[in-house]
């Protein structure tokens, strides 16, 4: 049945449309883009097999996290970037200054987003970017900043003066995923997502209490920065969202309509907060979120009509059906350089930029073929990022576990997010320990493994010509799986 479906999609594309290329995903990580001395970085996602003369629209991806947390390489941001690259976009996923201990970072966080747009335009030639076709997208706090980036022009007086002073910061299409559009009216919700009239949240990032400086709060709200010349806006919001009330999208749409600004809104029944373009299990959300975002960008950044947008998406579906192992858009599993020498006990030498670098993969690594090695290991205390479900009590059923090589992780189970999660070996098997609210609350979640349990390991660093993905195929005391090595193209320069 699957083969017939793939054949049908391919025939339709051949008979009625153009030959739409579906691109390999390349990534260049840890790129400085702000003024000297700033630690925030960005990652570039790009079509790795593009022709030398091809040019692509760009998209700035802005992570969420309540303006106080989150990271550019979280699962949602990886999913969005990977999907867009497949469809022929160059993306940058950015870090920006975060609020700490109640201290406000407005408007520096917003200016960081503007600087990212400037960086893309300054580096347009290296990125194969069409400089006057740049969009933005973000979720939650990132949705707020994305919408503000779309509508907040020079008249706000917040254009960055360095390091790219004078470079255009405008974008041509903005996507808001469940972001706060009016900071003065961010409602608390009932358990089913129904907003509570008159009860409001008050984020600390603004830098002043609303009673002290109400104009500052209004100024930082996208809904108050609209202009008839603003670019098209797409909003997606779950009606079951208990973090950001869906009235935010509703009120923003009304304001956009009143200004005559082209916009679309999708309110999604039964969906809560923090969704990406796909379900972690690679199932589409009920409202077809992914094709809606593709269609919006294809129309406004590529100039396609609705028929061509559908052909483009159908081509992606056909490609994914024919390449099921290459549709895991939740972690890119990146390593750096070429595997050069096996030192034993999981230690390998890789070559990068003419230098030899030693890395630790696992104690059981052997070359399986030119592009594959096998690996087995799960270490107690390893930083993890998991996807699955939690029951009413304490158990977690995992479909996927990402093993990270950084000092932080993020565990997302349905609509629940935990920071700083680690694997723990207990008498009853593996568990995940999570820390919430600093050190105030620790929880140990026993793991149950679904029939489709997979583990991915991600090594962080600049990508040159090696993409690494580890897929665990069984759990028997210790993990056993395979590490896939795929050649990628280098994006030279910063």
List the model feature ranges, each with a label:
Residues 18-54:
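N-terminal cap/lid segment of alpha/beta-hydrolase-fold proteins
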Residues 19-26, 150, 185-225, 231:
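Mobile cap/lid helix-loop segments that gate and shape the active-site cleft of serine hydrolases
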Residues 50-56, 62-104, 144, 156-157, ...:
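Short substrate-entry loop that stabilizes the transition state in hydrolases
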Residues 71-80, 92-131, 280-288:
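Catalytic nucleophile-loop/oxyanion-hole region of alpha/beta-hydrolase
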Residues 118-190:
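Primarily recognizes the serine-hydrolase "nucleophile elbow" in alpha/beta-hydrolase
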Residues 229, 235-237, 241:
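Short beta-strand/loop motif that positions the catalytic acidic residue
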Residues 242-251:
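Conserved alpha/beta-hydrolase "acid-adjacent" motif
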Residues 317-358, 368-448, 452, 456-494:
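Short, flexible, surface-exposed loop segments at domain boundaries
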């Amino acid at each position: 049945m699957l083969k017939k479906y793939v054949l049908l999609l391919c025939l339709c594309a051949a008979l009625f449309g153009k030959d739409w290329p579906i691109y390999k995903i390349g990534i260049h990580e840890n790129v400085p883009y702000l003024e000297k001395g700033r630690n925030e970085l960005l990652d570039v996602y790009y079509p790795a097999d593009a022709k030398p003369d091809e040019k692509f629209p760009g998209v700035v991806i802005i992570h969420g996290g309540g303006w106080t947390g989150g990271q550019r390489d979280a699962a949602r941001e990886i999913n969005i970037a990977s999907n867009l690259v497949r469809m022929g976009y160059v993306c940058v996923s950015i870090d920006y200054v975060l609020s700490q201990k109640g201290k406000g970072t407005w408007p520096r966080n917003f200016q960081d987003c503007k600087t990212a747009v400037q960086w893309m335009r300054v580096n347009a030639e290296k990125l194969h970017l069409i400089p006057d076709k740049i969009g933005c997208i973000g979720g939650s706090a990132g949705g707020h900043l994305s919408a503000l980036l779309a509508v907040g022009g020079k008249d706000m007086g917040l254009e960055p003066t360095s390091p790219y002073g004078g470079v255009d910061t405008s974008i041509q299409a903005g996507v808001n995923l469940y972001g706060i559009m009016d900071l003065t009216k961010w409602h608390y919700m009932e358990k089913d997502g129904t907003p509570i009239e008159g009860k409001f949240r008050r984020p600390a990032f603004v830098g002043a209490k609303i009673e002290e400086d109400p104009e500052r709060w209004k100024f930082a709200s996208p809904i108050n920065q609209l202009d008839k010349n603003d670019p098209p806006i797409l909003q997606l919001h779950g009606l079951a969202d208990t973090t950001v009330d869906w009235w935010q999208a509703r009120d923003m749409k009304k304001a956009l309509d009143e200004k005559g600004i082209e916009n679309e809104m999708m309110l999604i029944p039964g969906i809560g907060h923090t969704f990406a373009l796909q379900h972690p299990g690679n199932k589409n959300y009920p409202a077809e979120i992914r094709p809606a975002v593709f269609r919006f960008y294809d129309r406004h950044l590529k100039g396609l009509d609705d028929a061509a947008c559908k052909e483009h998406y159908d081509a992606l579906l056909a490609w994914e059906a024919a390449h099921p192992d290459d549709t895991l858009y939740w972690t890119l599993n990146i390593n750096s350089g070429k595997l050069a020498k096996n030192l034993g006990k999981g230690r390998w030498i890789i070559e990068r930029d003419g230098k030899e670098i030693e890395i630790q993969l696992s104690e059981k690594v052997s070359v399986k073929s030119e592009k594959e090695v096998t690996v087995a290991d799960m270490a107690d205390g390893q930083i993890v990022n998991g996807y699955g479900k939690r029951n009413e009590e304490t158990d977690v059923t995992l479909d996927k576990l990402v093993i990270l090589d950084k000092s932080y992780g993020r565990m997302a189970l349905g609509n629940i997010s935990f920071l700083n999660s680690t694997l723990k070996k207990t008498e009853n098997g593996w568990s995940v320990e999570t820390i919430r609210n600093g050190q105030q609350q620790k929880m140990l979640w026993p793991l149950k493994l679904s029939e489709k349990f997979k583990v991915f390991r991600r090594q962080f660093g600049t990508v040159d010509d090696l993409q690494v993905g580890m897929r665990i195929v069984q759990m028997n005391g210790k993990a056993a799986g395979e590490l896939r090595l795929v050649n990628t193209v280098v994006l030279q320069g910063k």
